Amino acid sequence: MWGYSESEEFALVPAPPAPAADAILPTLRLPSTPEKLVAVAALPGEARNNIFAWEQCRVLRTRLQQMLRERNLRTLLVTSTIAGEGKTLVAANLAMSFSQLEDRRVLLIDGDLRRPGLGAFFGHEARAGLSDCLSNGHKLADVLVHLHAHLDYLPTAAAFEHSVELLNRGRMRELIADCAAGYDLVVVDSAPLSPIADTQVLVRLVDAALLVVRAGAAPYPLVRQAAELLQPKLIGAVLNAVERGASQVYSNRYYYGPRPEDAK
């Protein structure tokens, strides 16, 4: 099984098997910006491509590293249009990849208060976490999990029903600011944009956002809406569960726009 091990090289957890290349989501131009939504990486969905997948994760890190440095961005939100597109795996592996850089301190936050998933990824069952910092007065230092020398993890202990109200409190803004001051990079795994509003609150508190899109998963109108909701913080997309041959093409020139049949 793919996952994190302190004694081994970090490994990317693959997404479910990919559909055919022609089933990749359509292209989409955003009305709010003349720029295309550029795919900063394309991750394969087949387990046999795990070496290639990890290389693509490093490609993602390299491209993001340049963007973050040039724009002085320290907090990055990772989300998706709907559940099941692989945003938690991308967030976790991205944080691990950045933490491999020399003298780079990284914090990974489980910001999906309704359906926290990072605990299962790391095999960690938290008794307290983000929601306790926001509602019960817990100190950040008391709930942080130290994964290795350069990577810390802020868990969410349990699903929280009234998450929007909790995230809207000023304490969340303060917590993000405190984390940005103490780490070189803060990666926030957030809830999917549809059908809840949590991420619309969180995206206002971070410097940048990354949209994970699983090939053939979310309907075109929802992906378009998700991209628009993340503006102006959206800096790119990660294509997940793409066939290896297709990913070599789409990682360089993929963008969103209507299918030819949509124009009929």
PLM regions and their residue ranges:
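Conserved beta-strand segments of the P-loop GTPase G domain that flank and frequently precede/overlap
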Residues: 77-79, 155-156, 188-189, 211-214, ...
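P-loop/Walker-type NTP enzyme "switch/lid" segment
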Residues: 30-62, 66-69, 81-85, 104-184, ...
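Hydrophobic positions on the alpha1 helix immediately C-terminal to the Walker A/P-loop
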Residues: 90, 94
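Long, basic/Gly/Ser/Thr-rich N-terminal segments
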Residues: 1-37
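Conserved Switch II/interswitch segment of TRAFAC-class P-loop GTPases
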Residues: 193-195, 206-223
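Pre-Walker A (Motif I) flank of P-loop NTPase domains
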Residues: 72-76
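Hydrophobic micro-sites
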Residues: 2-14, 224-264
